[in-house]
Amino acid sequence: MEKGLIAIGIGISMISGLGVGLGQGLAAGKAAEAVGRNPEAASKIRTMMLVGQAVAESAAIYALVISILLMFAFN
């Protein structure tokens, strides 16, 4: 019973990877559209996009760390 609940917790925490992937894809697409409309601002747009994606990726990294901790600490 307890191992099953741990497995469910690991699965739920890894669902955040799906959200992060979708969010980063949308951000990259919108950045490409913005550069297409205003090529002179490409460096500012790229910098802002990379900072935003780094912040979003940190959530996925935290979820991965939590999943690994659940997997090895409680088994």
Curated annotation (Swiss-Prot):
The record marks E57 as: Reversibly protonated during proton transport. GO terms for molecular function: lipid binding; proton-transporting ATP synthase activity, rotational mechanism. It is a multi-pass membrane protein. Keywords: ATP synthesis, Cell membrane, CF(0), Hydrogen ion transport, Ion transport, Lipid-binding, Membrane, Transmembrane, Transmembrane helix, Transport. Pfam families: ATP-synt_C. It is found in: Cell membrane. The chain crosses the membrane at residues 4-24, 54-74. Its main location: membrane. GO terms for cellular component: plasma membrane; proton-transporting ATP synthase complex; proton-transporting two-sector ATPase complex, proton-transporting domain. SUPFAM superfamilies: F1F0 ATP synthase subunit C. InterPro entries: ATP_synth_csu_bac/chlpt, ATP_synth_F0_csu, ATP_synth_F0_csu_DDCD_BS, ATPase_proteolipid_c-like_dom, F/V-ATP_Csub_sf. CDD domains: ATP-synt_Fo_c_NaATPase (cd18184). F-type ATPases have 2 components, F(1) - the catalytic core - and F(0) - the membrane proton channel. F(1) has five subunits: alpha(3), beta(3), gamma(1), delta(1), epsilon(1). F(0) has three main subunits: a(1), b(2) and c(10-14). The alpha and beta chains form an alternating ring which encloses part of the gamma chain. F(1) is attached to F(0) by a central stalk formed by the gamma and epsilon chains, while a peripheral stalk is formed by the delta and b chains. F(1)F(0) ATP synthase produces ATP from ADP in the presence of a proton or sodium gradient. F-type ATPases consist of two structural domains, F(1) containing the extramembraneous catalytic core and F(0) containing the membrane proton channel, linked together by a central stalk and a peripheral stalk. During catalysis, ATP synthesis in the catalytic domain of F(1) is coupled via a rotary mechanism of the central stalk subunits to proton translocation. Key component of the F(0) channel; it plays a direct role in translocation across the membrane. A homomeric c-ring of between 10-14 subunits forms the central stalk rotor element with the F(1) delta and epsilon subunits. Belongs to the ATPase C chain family. This is ATP synthase subunit c. It comes from Mycoplasmopsis agalactiae (strain NCTC 10123 / CIP 59.7 / PG2). The lineage of its organism: Bacteria, Bacillati, Mycoplasmatota, Mycoplasmoidales, Metamycoplasmataceae.
